[in-house]
Amino acid sequence: GAGEALNAKRQQDVNHLLDLIYDHLHY
């Protein structure tokens, strides 16, 4: 449903932000 799609999009956004944060932590 729409809720599931929204949750999936939010999870992707969170994962992307975590990737950026980890990249910065390595420097």
Swiss-Prot record:
What does the record say about tissue specificity?
Hemolymph.
A GO cellular component annotated for this chain's UniProt record is:
extracellular region
Keyword annotations for this protein? Answer: Copper, Oxygen transport, Secreted, Transport
Q: What is its main location?
A: secreted
List the GO molecular function terms: oxygen carrier activity
Location comes to:
Secreted, Extracellular space
What family does the entry list? Belongs to the tyrosinase family. Hemocyanin subfamily.
Which function does this protein serve? Hemocyanins are copper-containing oxygen carriers occurring freely dissolved in the hemolymph of many mollusks and arthropods.
Instruction: Name the chain's protein.
Output: Hemocyanin subunit 5
What is the native source organism of this protein?
Homarus americanus
